[in-house]
Amino acid sequence: GLAAKITEASNQDLQEAQKNGTLIIDIRRPEEWAQTGIIEGAELITAFTKSGQLHPEFQQKFMSVITDRETPIMLYCRTGNRTSNLGKALVDQLGFSNVSHLSQGITGWQKAQQPVQSYKASQ
C-alpha cells in the first residue's frame, strides 16, 4: 500500500488544534509529564514503556477517547521521534486518516516559550 502519511505540525498548528477541537494526545510517560509539564488540553495516554515496548494499556485508553477513524488527532512526545513512529502505525495498521504530530515535540514548544501546565500525579 501507500506509505503512511502523517502531517508534520508546528507549534502554531498545535495552537490551532487547541481551539478547533482536535484531539491532542501526550504519549509520554508520567515521569516525563512531571518533569516538563503538559500542554493545555492534552489527553495523557502513555504509548511506550521505558524500554520502548508498546504500553499494554495504550490501545484501550486510546480507543476510549477516539470517536471514529476520521477524528483529527495531534500527537506529541519529547522531540517527535516516538510520535512519528506511532502516528505511522495508527495510519497504517489501524486506518486512522487524520493524524499529525508536533515535529519538535514539547522540547520545541518550550524552546519557543509556549505555555505548559504542571502535571499532578492525581490526573
What are these regions (language model features)?
Residues 24-26:
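Structural scaffold elements adjacent to functional motifs in cytosolic proteins
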Residues 1-20, 30-74, 81-123:
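Rhodanese-like catalytic fold shared by cysteine-dependent sulfurtransferases
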